Structure formats: C-alpha cells, structure tokens
C-alpha cells in the first residue's frame, strides 16, 4: 500500500480590487488613473498600500530599470492620466448636452408607436428598459436599430406621457436618467399623393 504523499499545498488568493480602475491593486500602475488609484488605496488600506506602493516594493521594481527608462515610464503614465481625464470630461459634457428623444409615429390611421432614443448614454440597459415598458403598458416593446445605426426602444401605442412620468419618478431601469433632458417629437406619416380623377 502506498502512503499518501503530501506535496506543496496551494493557497487560495483573494485579490484586493481597486474601486477606481476595477483592477487588482497590483495592476493599478497599468491603468489610466494611477494617482487616483494610489490615493484611494492609501485611504482604504494602509497595509496594502505599503505592500504595493511602499518604498521597498517600488525599489525592488525600479532597481532593474535604468534612469532613462524610469523617466520615460513616468512621462507615459502622466500622459495616460491626462488622456483619461480628458476622455472622462468629454463624456460628461456629451452626456450633459444629449437629449432623450421620445417620438410618436403613426403606424396606421389609429395605431401609433413610441420611439425612445439616447437612453443608453445615461447607463440604461435598453433590453431591461424595453421589458419594463412591455410589462408596464401590456404592449409590445423591443430594442431596434435606427437607420443611422443607433439603438432605440420601440413601444406599440401612444405612451409618451407615461414614459416621461416614469423617467421623472426614476422607476426601475430608468434610475439616473435626467428628466430635464427630454424632447418630445411628433412624426406624421407622409400621405401618398392622390391620383387625379380621369
């Protein structure tokens, strides 16, 4: 009978994730916002900060780099941080200027559709919102593409007023959508040219 040989046991590792860049703290240096990550980690956990960014840890990593490479890495990190800050600022500006468009279009003489555009820019999952509208109004509701290639929610029926009210009340999937950035549009169906009587 062979006896059970115990080899090296594996230890389960629980990584500490950064709330700024969502990477494990060891990889924050490769993310776009190193200084924010450092400040957050120093606030949250001093021991982890010392392990990752302390003098000993930095000296062991930088010890193998030449002075030129070290300066280049610092310059690249500063560039990345500026770029990430500009990108975040541009997104915030775009979000601020974007309007939520609620269109009412005519399908037939008495049937209408309501189209909602630009909800995804405010962090709304369009499929969840479409399902919420279908349940609320007991009608068909789906996500479809516009001719411009953007996604919109199409709801069967004239429910524009109710949707505006749901956005104001921040119901379900519509949490975080600003009620002051709503634009209502009425799209009339083009009438076919009548043929002259002979």
From Swiss-Prot:
Q: Which InterPro entries match?
A: DENR/SUI1_TIF, DENR_C, DENR_eukaryotes, DENR_N, SUI1, SUI1_dom_sf
GO molecular function per UniProt:
mRNA binding; translation initiation factor activity
Any single GO BP term: translation reinitiation
Principal cellular location given in the protein's record? cytoplasm
Domain SUI1 as annotated: residue spans = 100-171
Q: Which residues form the signal peptide?
A: none
Query: Can you supply one Gene Ontology CC term for this chain's record?
Result: ribosome
- List the PROSITE patterns hit by this protein, alphabetically: SUI1
Give the location in the cell.
Answer: Cytoplasm
Q: What top-level branch of life does the organism fall under?
A: Eukaryota
Per UniProt, the keywords (alphabetical) are: Cytoplasm, Ribonucleoprotein, Ribosomal protein
Recorded hits in PANTHER family, A to Z, give: DENSITY-REGULATED PROTEIN, DENSITY-REGULATED PROTEIN HOMOLOG
The family assignment reads:
Belongs to the DENR family.
Quaternary structure (record): Interacts with the 40S ribosomal subunit.
Q: What is known of its domains?
A: The SUI1 domain may be involved in RNA binding.
| Record protein name field | Translation machinery-associated protein 22
């Amino acid at each position: 009978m062979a006896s059970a040989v115990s080899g090296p046991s594996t230890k389960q590792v629980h990584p500490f994730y950064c709330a700024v860049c969502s990477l494990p703290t060891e990889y924050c240096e490769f993310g776009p916002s190193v200084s924010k990550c450092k400040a957050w980690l120093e606030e949250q956990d001093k021991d982890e900060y010392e392990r990752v960014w302390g003098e000993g840890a930095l000296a062991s990593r930088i010890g193998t780099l030449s002075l030129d490479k070290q300066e280049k890495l610092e310059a690249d990190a500063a560039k990345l941080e500026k770029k990430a800050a500009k990108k975040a600022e541009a997104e915030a500006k775009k979000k601020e200027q974007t309007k939520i468009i609620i269109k009412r279009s005519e399908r037939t003489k008495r049937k209408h559709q309501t189209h909602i555009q630009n909800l995804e820019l405010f962090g709304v999952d369009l499929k969840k919102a479409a399902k919420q509208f279908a349940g609320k109004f007991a009608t068909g509701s789906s996500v479809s593409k516009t001719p411009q290639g953007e996604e919109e929610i199409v709801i069967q029926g004239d429910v524009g007023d109710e949707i505006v009210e749901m956005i104001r009340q921040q119901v379900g999937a519509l949490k975080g959508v600003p009620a002051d950035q709503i634009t209502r549009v009425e799209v009339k169906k083009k009438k076919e040219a009548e043929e002259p009587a002979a």
